[in-house]
């Protein structure tokens, strides 16, 4: 016996003696048999325990040591039964040195039969046994099938072997093994791939060929095998024949296959991995001791709880019921055992819950080597990279297919993370990488390492290169240093790993430089980098002058120069010299006292525009100045927008950033010159430090004390203010700046790079991998995959913002464009200024058709547009337009002529700056005319110049177009139209008509009211202050049945081009049309409404019922007298007939007028223009004021009827009707009834030359009298457009009169409108004449659109319009008691008589017609007959219908 064996045997003897000594004590004893099967040498290798190991337990174990050499089932059963009979054994600890799993089956059978706990601690007794009996009390020191399958999968997961196959025989437990593997991979997050599952039947004949055929299906690199050791020997032999046991294939087997580690079959391949029970750290004496402790501890627990322990078994037969109960109770305690702090519990199947397992590897020496340990569900392997090349002696030829690659953690190129806590492995987008830990007391069995997961920009590149080049790899992290630095001739870091050939490649943020290229090969750079500088933002302050900083001083000065000197002066000059500007109107006297446009106003206007201030400004009127202001407004938009956009960068609290130009900057080269000193550093042992050391030695020596251990430490130092700048690789710094929280870290110059280089892959020198790797990298660039990776990994959230606040002032170069625009606008304005004057003074009249005598281009275009819109046919032949066939029923022809007339009115000379002064055409009318209506005086109709407008008759034309569709072509629908002056601008405006004495008075800013068709009593200022003339307007009773006259029927051939909205019907009874009228007033110009607003008050006052003993006087009598004296005073260059001295009327009117009753019945009317013309014809000696007519003569005149269009007497008139029919016309007028007959003047002149015999009056209230001949002036008819030019060339002595009372300077001499306001030259007043009932000349209306007289003007409004609209103003009359002759009279006839008497002059004779104001029928009739309304009026006032001639 060898000494060692004797020593082990002595130890076991001492243990037995110890337990026997415990038996002698009073504690209850537990008999336990320890059976060891094997040779003497094996049995002798045992250990001895301390005597006091179980001293603390209440049950004392009594151990019996039994050794035997036979391992057959019969010998084992016989030996155990003998021990039970002899020793009363209560428990068995069994160990053997065989690989026979049959021993475990025999022991399981004995435990079921004897209900004795048996523990298999070694050899065959501890091997896997499937399908134990239900009542079995056999426990094994070993892992179960499921536990071993889990460890095998953990090994594969550790080395990322996810593709595998399963090969099993039909040995019991194979289904459990297969099911465990399947359930694990199905419930795992790891991407397992189970390719094949093969079941081999070892009992078949010709098994070799069948196994070969099945094994040939295997293609996976990892194969899991479950079988017995004998079956495995045969399977490996067949697998070797088919090439499945060499390089590239890894077999993993359970402990059942490995068996006894001391015996290794030759068929087992090298590199075989097995899961085995730990025999290195858990030897047989320790197992024996733990076996005894488990049984003793369970019995002690049972004793403490139940005060009993299982009784010993006397034999293997006759099992008592009490024994069964006690056995089951003991098994429950055996499952849960803890001894000396170690968990020795078992599962229900009898396997240890926490077995001590190891992973063993069959190395090249054909010995089992422990390469890993599995404890507490944690696997630790010896090799962080599987030593595949060390296992196969002929594997040099396969080294190119599996590579070991080293890397270095540095985001974003390599990012290291922990494994997934749920699965314990890496996710799919990561790659397993291992970091080795080298402890000081490292054992021979190998070092420790930590499994991590790597991802990042370089890892993705590595995966794509490996897929392209087709190689596998194991990745690990470098431990000795960083990128690599040569220290004392030895390289460390990743370069050192490649140089020492521990790694084939180095992948990461490895900079290519010359020194490294001498020892390793670099691939082409996959990213460009260099040296960059990172700084931290620091808060700043806002400057007090920040609001001026958006523009430089030059821009501010230039803007004010352009504003004050250039633009404002230019606008002022253009406006001053503009023909339609403010100052030109002042210079021409067209707007005395009106506004002026000064240079101060120009500056204020431009200042308000450039700063967008809502201030009251005065806009220019000239076209050139408007263009200049418009361009300035565009300049202001650009200027203000640029200022506002750039202001935000200066008004915010700016963040200060240190600016450096490069490594040569003085902040780096002379950092101590600054206060405080500039602090900067880098990470040592890198290419950045090497570059600085080689090129800037002083800089390197200064920065050493500020160097940082890592990039993360440097970032913290920057944020905390310990470091002012950090110098490092540009790619890394750009990534860190983009991912920085708060974006406080920035790289200077938005990532400016110095000493540009790149990152590459380091490869072993002359290994042959460089070309393949270069081609793979270039392919990534070509496919665009490299750009995708850069966008994925190298872009941060802060990259979307500006890294620095780089605000700069806008200089002249930035704003030059807008100043160029102003200069171009100045040049364009000069050209426009010249063209404006050229057109205004030279070309304007030609465009309007004055030069050619034909319709101008503007009119032609307007007519064409109107024709296209309204479908009106245009007559091409001029004769067709002017022929008599174009009668009143020809609507289209009349429309065309109306448009031509409107065009002619718009093109009148004297409008819009005509060189002919308007003062030359002021018409002086009678004083009676001016007395009746101050505000309608021709001489003083406006105190301020008329402001020309673009379309003078726009309101008239729009009124015609608006009312055309509602006109009826029936003579029964007759009316008399009203003429309104052109609308003034606004009440109180600079262009409004001022009063006779005060231009600011409201009545003189309004339009006159028509007084036609109603006899009015005229109140003149009395010579004596006590008596007063009654209210002229208040004498009317508008609803009286006696309101009428022979001329009462309204003529239907007169046109209305007024500013009134024309309707017809009862105002009160027709609410709908009244509402339409009100709505139209809302759309009227403000000027058209304002006149009516004032007239409504005045007319309401005048319509108020008055007593007959009241009369009116004008307030300023003396001023009125002086006005008329000056009006009729002869002036230079004016004919005598325009100045008639009427002062004798006022001087002699008192008593003669008052007591003369011969004129009380005067009813005929005489226009002022008639006796003025008569006065010119007969001279001063035959003044019309001195002639009188008797009552008989007046009655004779009244008994005759006259043509409605001319002064011809109708001899066949019966005189039965009180109202003269509107259809009565003489033969000559019927012949000349063509509206546009150009020869009608000749026929009318002949007609005027014939004497007229008035028949006896048939009026019921008028006495018969003789007719008196009347001296008549020549009748001037207005002409159609065709003769317009010819008439202009004639020397017409009569001064023209504008259609609008306000626009006096519209017409030149010879204009077709020269006779518009001229009354027929009737016979002057005679001393014996009585008021005739009718004056045919006073109410003549022309069918021409260019009438001869005011009563023939189709555009003059009638009094009926004012009846409906009731406009007025406050009265300007005094009331005083009427003269005695008017007492008791409520109507206006008495007032008319008194008024006539006062006007009769010294001789007591009166004029036939007393004319009042500028009214369409301006003569007051003294007709006694009551005037009645139309039979259909029912006493109501009717609004008129608009018309364009009677046939429209």
UniProtKB/Swiss-Prot annotation:
Residues 25-554, 644-819 are extracellular. The chain crosses the membrane at residues 555-573, 628-643, 820-839. One of its GO terms (molecular function) is NMDA glutamate receptor activity. Zn(2+) binds at residues 122, 279. Residues 1267-1277 have a biased composition (Basic residues). Its main location: membrane. Residues 601-620 are annotated as: Pore-forming. It is found in: Cell membrane; Postsynaptic cell membrane. Glycans are attached at residues 336, 685. Residues 1-24 form the signal peptide. Detected in oocytes. Component of N-methyl-D-aspartate (NMDA) receptors (NMDARs) that function as heterotetrameric, ligand-gated cation channels with high calcium permeability and voltage-dependent block by Mg(2+). Channel activation requires binding of the neurotransmitter L-glutamate to the GluN2 subunit, glycine binding to the GluN1 subunit, plus membrane depolarization to eliminate channel inhibition by Mg(2+). NMDARs mediate simultaneously the potasium efflux and the influx of calcium and sodium. Heterotetramer. Forms heterotetrameric channels composed of two GluN1/zeta subunits (GRIN1), and two identical GluN2/epsilon subunits (GRIN2A, GRIN2B, GRIN2C or GRIN2D) or GluN3 subunits (GRIN3A or GRIN3B) (in vitro). In vivo, the subunit composition may depend on the expression levels of the different subunits. This is Glutamate receptor ionotropic, NMDA 2B. It comes from Xenopus laevis (African clawed frog). The gene is grin2b.
């Amino acid at each position: 016996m060898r000494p060692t064996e004797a020593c082990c045997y002595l130890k076991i003897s001492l243990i037995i003696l110890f337990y026997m000594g415990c038996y002698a004590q009073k504690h209850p004893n537990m008999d336990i048999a320890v059976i060891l099967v094997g040779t003497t040498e094996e049995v002798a290798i045992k250990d001895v325990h301390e005597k006091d190991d179980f001293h603390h337990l209440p049950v004392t174990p009594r151990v019996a040591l039994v050794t035997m050499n036979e391992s057959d089932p019969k010998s084992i059963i016989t030996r155990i039964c003998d021990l039970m009979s002899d020793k009363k054994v209560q428990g068995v600890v069994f160990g053997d040195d065989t690989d026979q799993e049959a021993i475990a089956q025999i022991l399981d059978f004995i435990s079921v039969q004897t209900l004795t706990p048996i523990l298999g601690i070694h050899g065959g007794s501890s091997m896997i046994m499937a399908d134990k009996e239900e009542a079995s009390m056999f426990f094994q020191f070993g892992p179960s099938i499921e536990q071993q399958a889990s460890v095998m999968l953990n090994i594969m997961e550790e080395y990322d072997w996810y593709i595998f196959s399963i090969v099993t025989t039909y040995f019991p437990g194979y289904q459990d093994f297969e099911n465990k593997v399947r359930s694990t991979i199905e419930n795992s997050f790891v991407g397992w791939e189970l390719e094949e599952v093969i079941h081999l039947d070892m009992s078949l004949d010709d098994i070799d060929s069948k196994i070969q055929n099945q094994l040939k299906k295997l293609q996976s690199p990892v194969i899991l095998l479950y079988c017995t050791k004998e079956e495995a020997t045969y399977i490996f032999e067949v697998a070797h024949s088919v090439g499945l046991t060499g390089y590239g294939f890894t077999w993993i087997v359970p402990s059942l296959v490995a068996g006894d580690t001391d015996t290794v079959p030759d068929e087992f391949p090298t590199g075989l991995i097995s899961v085995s029970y730990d025999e290195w750290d858990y030897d047989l004496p320790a197992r024996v001791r733990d076996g005894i402790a488990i049984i003793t501890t369970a019995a002690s627990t049972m004793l403490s709880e139940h005060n009993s322990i299982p009784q010993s078994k006397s034999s293997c037969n006759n099992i008592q019921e009490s024994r069964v109960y006690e056995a089951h109770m003991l098994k429950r305690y055996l499952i849960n055992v803890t001894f000396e702090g170690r968990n020795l519990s078992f599962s229900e199947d009898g396997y240890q819950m926490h077995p001590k397992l190891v992973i063993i590897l069959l190395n090249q020496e054909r010995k089992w080597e422990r390469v890993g340990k599995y404890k507490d569900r944690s696997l630790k392997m010896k090799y962080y990279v599987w030593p595949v090349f060390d296992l196969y002696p002929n594997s040099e030829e396969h080294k190119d297919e599996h590579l070991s690659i080293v890397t270095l953690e540095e985001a974003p190129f390599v990012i290291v993370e922990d494994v997934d806590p749920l699965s314990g492995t890496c996710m799919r987008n990561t790659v397993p990488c291992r970091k080795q830990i080298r402890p000081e007391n490292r054992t021979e069995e190998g070092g420790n390492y930590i499994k991590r997961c790597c991802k990042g920009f370089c890892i993705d590149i590595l995966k794509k290169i490996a897929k392209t080049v087709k190689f596998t790899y194991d990745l690990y992290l470098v431990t000795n240093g960083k990128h690599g630095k040569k220290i004392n001739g030895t390289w460390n870091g990743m370069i050192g790993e490649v140089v020492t050939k521990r790694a084939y490649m180095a992948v990461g943020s490895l900079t290519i430089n010359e020194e490294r290229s001498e020892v390793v090969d670099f691939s082409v750079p996959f990213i460009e980098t260099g040296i960059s500088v990172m700084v931290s933002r620091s808060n700043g302050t806002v400057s007090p002058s920040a609001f001026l900083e958006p523009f430089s001083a030059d821009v501010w000065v230039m803007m004010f120069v352009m504003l004050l000197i250039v633009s404002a002066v230019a606008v002022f000059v253009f406006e001053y010299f503009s023909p339609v500007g403010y100052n030109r109107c002042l210079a021409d006297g067209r707007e005395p006292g009106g506004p002026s446009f000064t240079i101060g106003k120009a500056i204020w206007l431009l200042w308000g525009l450039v700063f967008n201030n809502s201030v009251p400004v005065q806009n220019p009127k000239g076209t050139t100045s408007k263009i200049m202001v418009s361009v300035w407004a565009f300049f202001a938009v650009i200027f203000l927008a640029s200022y506002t956009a750039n202001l935000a960068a200066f008004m915010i609290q700016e963040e200060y950033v240190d600016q450096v130009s490069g490594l040569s900057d003085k902040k780096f080269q002379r950092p101590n010159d600054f206060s405080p000193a500039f602090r900067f550093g880098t990470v040592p042992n890198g290419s950045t430090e090497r570059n600085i050391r080689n090129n800037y030695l002083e800089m390197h020596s200064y920065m050493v004390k500020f160097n940082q251990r890592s990039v993360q430490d440097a970032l913290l130092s920057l944020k905390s203010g310990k470091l002012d700048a950090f110098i490092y690789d540009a790619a890394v710094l750009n990534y860190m700046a983009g991912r920085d929280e708060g974006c406080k870290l920035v790289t200077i110059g938005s990532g400016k790079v110095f000493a540009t280089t790149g990152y590459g892959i380091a490869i072993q020198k002359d290994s042959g991998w460089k070309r393949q790797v270069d081609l793979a990298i270039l392919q990534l660039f070509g496919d665009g995959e490299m750009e995708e990776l850069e966008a994925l990994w190298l872009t941060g959230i802060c990259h979307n913002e500006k890294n620095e606040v780089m605000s700069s002032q806008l200089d002249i170069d930035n704003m030059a464009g807008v100043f160029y625009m102003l200069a171009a606008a100045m040049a364009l304005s000069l050209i426009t200024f010249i063209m404006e004057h050229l057109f205004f003074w030279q070309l304007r009249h030609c465009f309007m058709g004055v030069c050619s005598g034909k319709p101008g281009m503007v009119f032609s275009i307007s007519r064409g547009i109107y024709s296209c819109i309204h479908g009106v046919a245009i007559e091409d032949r001029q004769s067709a337009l002017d022929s008599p066939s174009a009668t009143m029923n020809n609507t289209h022809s009349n429309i065309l002529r109306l448009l031509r007339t409107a065009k002619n009115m718009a093109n009148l000379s004297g409008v819009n700056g005509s060189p002919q002064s308007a003062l030359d055409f002021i018409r002086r009318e009678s004083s009676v005319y001016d007395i009746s209506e101050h505000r309608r005086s021709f001489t003083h109709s406006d105190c301020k110049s008329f402001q020309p407008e673009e379309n003078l008759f726009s309101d008239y034309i729009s009124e015609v177009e608006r009312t055309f569709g509602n006109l009826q072509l029936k003579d029964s629908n007759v009316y008399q139209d009203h003429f309104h002056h052109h609308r003034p601008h606004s009440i109180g405006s600079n262009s409004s008509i001022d009063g006779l004495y005060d231009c600011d008075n409201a009545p003189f800013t309004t339009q006159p009211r028509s007084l036609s068709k109603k006899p009015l009593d005229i109140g003149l200022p009395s010579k004596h202050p006590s008596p007063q003339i009654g209210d002229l307007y208040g004498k009317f009773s508008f609803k009286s049945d006696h309101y009428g006259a022979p001329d009462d029927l309204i003529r239907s051939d007169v046109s209305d081009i007024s500013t009134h909205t024309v309707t017809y019907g009862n105002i009160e009874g027709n609410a709908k049309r009244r509402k339409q009228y009100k709505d139209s007033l809302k759309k009227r110009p403000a000027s058209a409404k304002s006149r009516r607003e004032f007239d409504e008050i005045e007319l309401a006052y005048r319509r108020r019922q008055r007593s007959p003993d009241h009369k009116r006087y004008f307030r300023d009598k003396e001023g009125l007298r002086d006005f008329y004296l000056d009006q009729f005073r002869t002036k230079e260059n004016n004919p005598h007939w325009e100045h008639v001295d009427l002062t004798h009327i006022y001087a002699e009117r008192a008593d003669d007028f008052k007591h003369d009753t011969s004129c009380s019945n005067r009813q005929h009317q005489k226009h002022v223009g008639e006796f003025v013309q008569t006065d010119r014809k007969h001279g001063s000696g035959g003044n019309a004021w001195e002639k009188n007519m008797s009552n008989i003569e007046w009655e004779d005149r009244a008994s005759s009827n006259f043509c409605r269009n001319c002064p011809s007497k109708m001899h066949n008139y019966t005189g039965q009707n009180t109202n003269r029919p509107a259809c009565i016309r003489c033969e000559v007028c019927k012949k000349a009834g063509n509206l546009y007959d150009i020869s009608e003047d000749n026929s009318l002149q002949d007609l005027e030359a014939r004497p007229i015999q008035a028949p006896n009056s048939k009026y019921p209230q008028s006495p018969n009298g003789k007719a008196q001949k009347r001296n008549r002036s020549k009748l001037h008819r207005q002409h159609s457009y065709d003769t317009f030019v010819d008439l202009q060339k004639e020397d017409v002595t009569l001064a023209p009169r504008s259609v609008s009372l306000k626009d006096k300077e519209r017409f030149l001499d010879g204009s077709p409108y020269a006779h518009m306001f001229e009354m027929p030259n009737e016979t002057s007043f005679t001393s014996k004449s009585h008021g005739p009932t009718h004056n045919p000349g006073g109410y003549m209306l022309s069918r021409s659109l260019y009438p001869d007289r005011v009563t023939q003007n189709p555009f003059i409004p009638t009094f009926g319009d004012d009846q409906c609209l009731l406009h007025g103003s406050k009265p300007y009359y005094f009331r005083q008691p009427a003269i005695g002759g008017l007492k008791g009279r409520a109507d206006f006839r008495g007032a008319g008589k008194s008024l006539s008497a006062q006007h009769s002059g010294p001789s007591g004779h009166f004029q036939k017609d007393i004319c009042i104001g500028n009214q369409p029928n301006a003569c007051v009739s003294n007709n006694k007959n009551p005037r009645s309304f139309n039979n259909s009026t029912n006493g109501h006032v009717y609004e008129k219908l608009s018309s364009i001639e009677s046939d429209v």
